[in-house]
């Protein structure tokens, strides 16, 4: 790596408000890879995108604030290359600068990126000697900087991508049983493929959140004005039938916390007591008790989706108890724990508990597609 030019694909798609970064998680996660390459005296050329400029230059989506943040964190000068990539013909242009860390301007300013254009990828590959993908969260996209560049250069995974794939393998292929999945979210249709793929490998699948309301209603109970998805009985039947065949237990709430509105006071109810003007906003104490016992008896746990409307502290108790129980087992080295999904990560951030899990994925779509058993273009390209 010494003095080699490393094309490093990162996901620096951080939330920006008026040129200010509001959450630096994605930047913090890739610092080990950057520091490793700096230590090896490599020249680093970073490729990333922010937002959806759709192949046009959008000033508000420049990587300039990200360069400034990287500069602060690395304590090193970081140069933003604003030149049109398509007009840079050779890698020697990097030698004109003294810096060791370069960032090419938003790769999605070029329509060729999302079109997975082979010629565009070849042009970019001319700038480097080696390609490294440390953007697991973008690896479900067949885009030029993810899928095509590896055709032109020796290509490797970055440290963060490696961690992510190894952690996900421990819940999909190299499993220590008993293994439990706690899965939530508002729509079954967005998680059906994950559930179907996991049933044959898992001992327990615990359904919480808005999705659980469909199960509660399917088994003959009133869910009032609760959030639920329409027309999904067929999906439920499919889940129930596969789980029986594969001897995987499907668990849904036995009691619930309801209120008349999102800001109302919480009330604990049995499933047959929910009134038509009430909404289910969390799991009840009996359900919490059941879930914590299952966690105690598990060796591996995957958590994707809070148990209730955790944004209101009145309805966050179920999710907090799940988090506490997983952390307790983690600290005692009794469990391997993986969590992922925007709301789950947000909840763990609120509890300052992100580092209390073996692995917390911030990868969103790529995380779910991996759990669905799909091949991710970025991983396929590296293989």
Roles of regions detected by a PLM:
Residues 1-383:
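Active-site loop-to-helix "anion-binding N-cap" substructures in soluble metabolic enzymes
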């Amino acid at each position: 790596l010494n003095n080699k030019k490393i094309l490093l694909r990162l996901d620096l798609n951080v939330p920006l408000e008026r040129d200010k970064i509001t959450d630096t998680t994605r930047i913090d996660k890739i610092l080990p890879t950057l520091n490793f390459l700096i230590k090896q005296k490599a020249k680093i050329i970073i490729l990333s995108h922010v937002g959806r400029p759709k192949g046009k230059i959008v000033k508000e989506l420049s990587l300039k604030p990200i360069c400034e943040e990287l500069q602060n964190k690395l304590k090193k000068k970081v140069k933003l290359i604003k030149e049109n990539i398509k007009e840079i013909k050779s890698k020697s242009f990097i030698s004109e600068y003294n810096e060791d860390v370069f960032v090419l301007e938003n790769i999605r300013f070029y329509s060729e990126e999302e079109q997975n254009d082979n010629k565009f990828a070849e042009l970019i590959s001319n700038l480097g000697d080696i390609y490294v993908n440390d953007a697991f969260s973008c690896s479900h996209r067949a885009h030029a900087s993810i899928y095509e560049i590896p055709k032109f250069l020796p290509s490797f995974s970055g440290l963060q991508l490696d961690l992510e794939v190894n952690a996900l393998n421990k819940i999909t292929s190299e499993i220590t049983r008993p293994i439990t999945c706690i899965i939530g979210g508002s729509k079954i249709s967005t998680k059906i493929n994950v559930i179907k793929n996991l049933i044959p490998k898992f001992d327990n699948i615990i359904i919480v959140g808005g999705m659980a309301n469909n199960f509660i209603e399917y088994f003959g109970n009133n869910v009032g004005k609760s959030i639920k998805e329409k027309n999904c009985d067929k999906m439920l039947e499919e889940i129930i039938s596969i789980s029986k065949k594969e001897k995987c237990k499907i668990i849904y709430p036995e009691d619930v916390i309801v209120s008349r509105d999102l800001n109302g006071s919480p009330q604990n109810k049995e499933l047959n007591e929910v009134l038509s003007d009430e909404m289910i906003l969390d799991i009840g104490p009996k359900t919490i008790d059941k879930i914590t016992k299952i966690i105690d008896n598990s060796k591996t746990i995957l958590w994707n989706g809070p148990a209730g409307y955790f944004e209101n502290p009145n309805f966050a108790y179920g999710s907090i108890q799940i988090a506490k129980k997983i952390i307790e087992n983690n600290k005692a080295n009794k469990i391997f724990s993986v969590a992922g999904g925007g709301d789950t990560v947000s909840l763990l951030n609120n509890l300052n508990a992100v580092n209390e899990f073996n692995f917390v994925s911030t990868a969103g779509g790529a995380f779910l597609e991996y759990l669905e058993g799909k091949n991710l273009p970025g991983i396929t390209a590296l293989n």
